[in-house]
Amino acid sequence: MKFNPFVTSDRSKNRKRHFNAPSHIRRKIMSSPLSKELRQKYNVRSMPIRKDDEVQVVRGHYKGQQIGKVVQVYRKKYVIYIERVQREKANGTTVHVGIRPSKVVITRLKLDKDRKKILERKAKSRQVGKEKGKYKEETIEKMQE
C-alpha cells in the first residue's frame, strides 16, 4: 500500500529513474550486504561498494568461489568487476565478468576516515531505531506514581 502521495509506484517511472540515475545516486543503489562477522562488528547491514573491498559472490554462476578484491566499480552498467571472476573470450584473452553488487557479500572493507564516519553514523541511527518506542525505567516509575 502506498503511504506517501509524493512518491510514485508507477513501474515505468521507477525504471526511468533507475536507468537515468546520476552517479551519486547510482553509488547508493550499488550497495552490498556485509558478511555476518562485519555486521556484528559494525552493527551495519549494508554499504555502498567500492574498489579494493573484498567480496564473495553468493548468487549466480560464480557463487561460492574464493574471496576476491573489487577491481572496478562500473556505475554506468551497475556492475562490479572482481579479481578472480573472469572468463576466456573466443580469441583467448581473459576478461572480467560483471557482477551485480546485490549478488555479493562484503567480507572486508577498505576503511578510510570518511568510510569510518559513515559506519559510525549508520550504526548510531540503527541504535536509535532499536530504542524507539521503548520506555526507560524512570518514565515507567513516574507513570506508576
Curated annotation (Swiss-Prot):
As for subcellular location, the record says: Cytoplasm
Q: List the GO terms this entry assigns under cellular component, sorted alphabetically.
A: cytoplasm; cytosolic large ribosomal subunit; cytosolic ribosome; nucleolus; nucleoplasm; ribonucleoprotein complex; synapse; terminal bouton
One GO molecular-function entry: RNA binding
CDD domains per record: KOW_RPL26 (cd06089)
Q: Which domain of life is it from?
A: Eukaryota
Single GO BP term = positive regulation of translation
Positions bearing Phosphothreonine: T139
Predominant cellular place of this UniProt entry's protein: cytoplasm
Quick check: keyword Ubl conjugation in the entry? yes
Cite the entry's keywords alphabetically: Cytoplasm, Isopeptide bond, Phosphoprotein, Ribonucleoprotein, Ribosomal protein, Ubl conjugation
Question: Annotated region Disordered: where?
Answer: 1-21, 122-145
Using the UniProt entry, state the residues involved in the cross-link Glycyl lysine isopeptide (Lys-Gly) (interchain with G-Cter in SUMO2), renumbered to this chain: K136
How does it get modified post-translation?
A: Ufmylated by UFL1 in response to endoplasmic reticulum stress, promoting reticulophagy of endoplasmic reticulum sheets.
Q: Supply the InterPro entries for this chain.
A: KOW (IPR005824), Rib_uL2_dom2 (IPR014722), Ribosomal_uL24_CS (IPR005825), Ribosomal_uL24_euk/arc (IPR005756), Ribosomal_uL24_KOW (IPR041988), Translation_prot_SH3-like_sf (IPR008991)
PROSITE patterns cross-referenced by the UniProt entry: RIBOSOMAL_L24
Instruction: Say if the entry is tagged with keyword Ubl conjugation.
Output: yes
Role this protein plays: Component of the large ribosomal subunit. The ribosome is a large ribonucleoprotein complex responsible for the synthesis of proteins in the cell.
**Oligomer status and interactors:** Component of the large ribosomal subunit. Interacts with DHX33.
What NCBIfam families does the record point to? rplX_A_E (TIGR01080)
The text of the family note is:
Belongs to the universal ribosomal protein uL24 family.
* Name of this protein: Large ribosomal subunit protein uL24
Protein's gene:
Rpl26
